[in-house]
Amino acid sequence: MESECLELNKRFITYNTHQRPYIILKWAQTANGFLDNEGKGMAVSSAFTKMLSHKLRAENDAILVGRVTDERDHSLLNVRDWYGKNPVRLVIDRHHPCFDGLDFSKGKAEVLHQIMSFLYINKVQSLIVEGGAITHQSFLDAGLWDEIRIETATSKFVKTGTEAPRLPHDVKPISHAEYDDNVIDIYERSRH
């Protein structure tokens, strides 16, 4: 019963304990571990897994991508294939900061901590990070993550592209689901 309560309240608990949102890193990759095809965006999700992605967006307060992903994909980052409230859309871009006072002069980790503080102050309890590779790796390197969701298109291969981030060593698989030719794996931090 205790584990069910913790799962149900994980966003609230993380927000109040760590003074930051609960962070979900989410990406879709090819069977051979690429996020794109030679730097060009491509559809990896099926219609069904795209709908699941929009459901996840509706369940969380904010969504974040890096500048390159935003410029390449022009994604609306909203809830189109599900119902519910759109998450707050954030883009990490030094030329167009997502809020006043964001200081890029101190490095990636500090920028992420500034964003987490901003989200905490604005009562954002949950954040999905949808890309790209540099942004995901920055969150991983800073230890700013609670859950990782990876969708793999098991029958899609590309010759070259942007490699998917590497999973950290302190992960524990918590879910594996197959949907036609796509698989969604969910990981959380190992509790020692």
Segment roles from a protein language model:
Residues 1-7:
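Active-site loop-to-helix "anion-binding N-cap" substructures in soluble metabolic enzymes
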